[in-house]
């Protein structure tokens, strides 16, 4: 937000328009999760936010939840344009599970792999996924894999042992060049949110999972941006967040119906190609730039 002040000065000095690209909405997100509690600082950031929206010629947002939030703050609808974040669909793409290095290296061959890979923070309740795994521990073919930062994994390992989740494997982040094969090792990709996550939150992993061609199970609020994105794509199932039984039921459904998992993955891949490919996003930004300078 502070960068909006020099941007406005440069805009006035050179007579050029400002395009504000919103990847998050502050201070709303920080206040909602308790990272920002000082009332004076909240007022400062709120004032900067209003200034940024007022001085911008156009505001590009990454999802419809952002649009709804801005409209409640009386930002003119004609200022707002939705341009989603892109994914490299030539890099992240469906690959065969057979002879997959990630499966071989981690003894996952013959397993139904439920994969969560990414940030493990305040808004991602991975304990729910571990609890769901406990419900499935008697089905040896189902393996839950969580990939993340070492520090967060240490905390989860204690919880895993405490719950007796022997079917949960915790692994560190993989090198970027191995990401496509890691995603391809999964039968199901997970998106996890707490029930009270701010509604406009749009995890960037959704585009990546869709592009990988694997079915998604999203444990997210039904009225949130993430749920709408997955439902529109046709690439996954949405279940009640922080509900281990509901999550276990969804995992079991795809385990017992591999054809459904395949169909969801194919639909997700098609949606990613049509809506999240780099070329699509680039075209939208080119049109936006042409519009503001014409």
Residue ranges and their predicted role:
Residues 93-107:
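A short helix/loop element that forms part of the nucleotide-sugar donor recognition site in Leloir-type
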Residues 65, 83-86:
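Carbohydrate-associated surface elements
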Residues 108-124, 130-134, 145:
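Conserved donor-binding/catalytic core segment of Leloir-type glycosyltransferases
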Residues 2-5, 9-17, 39-61:
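Membrane-proximal helix-turn-helix segments that form the acceptor-binding/catalytic region
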């Amino acid at each position: 937000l502070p960068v909006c002040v020099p941007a406005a000065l440069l805009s006035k000095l050179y007579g050029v328009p400002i395009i504000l690209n919103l990847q998050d909405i502050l201070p709303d997100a920080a206040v909602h999760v308790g990272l920002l509690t000082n009332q004076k600082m909240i007022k400062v950031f709120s004032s900067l936010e209003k200034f940024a929206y007022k001085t911008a010629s156009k505001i590009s947002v990454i999802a419809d939840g952002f649009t709804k939030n801005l409209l409640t703050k009386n930002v003119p609808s004609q200022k707002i344009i939705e341009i989603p974040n892109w994914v490299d669909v030539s890099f992240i793409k469906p690959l065969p599970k057979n002879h997959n290095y990630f499966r071989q290296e981690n003894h996952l061959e013959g397993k139904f792999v439920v994969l969560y890979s990414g940030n493990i923070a305040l808004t991602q309740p991975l304990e729910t996924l571990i609890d769901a795994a406990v419900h499935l521990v008697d089905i040896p073919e189902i393996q839950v894999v969580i990939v993340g930062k070492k520090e967060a994994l240490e905390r989860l390992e204690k919880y895993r042992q405490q719950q007796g989740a022997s079917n949960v494997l915790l692994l560190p982040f993989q090198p970027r060049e191995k990401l496509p094969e890691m995603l391809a090792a999964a039968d199901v990709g997970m998106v996890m949110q707490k029930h009270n996550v701010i509604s406009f939150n749009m995890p960037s992993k959704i585009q990546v999972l869709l592009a990988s061609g694997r079915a998604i199970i999203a444990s997210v609020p039904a009225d949130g941006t993430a749920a709408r994105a997955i439902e529109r794509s046709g690439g996954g199932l949405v279940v009640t967040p922080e509900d281990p039984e509901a999550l276990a039921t969804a995992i079991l459904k795809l385990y017992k119906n591999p054809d459904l998992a395949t169909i969801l993955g194919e639909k997700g891949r098609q949606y990613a190609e049509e809506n999240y490919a780099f070329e699509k996003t680039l075209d939208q930004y080119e049109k936006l730039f042409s519009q503001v300078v014409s």
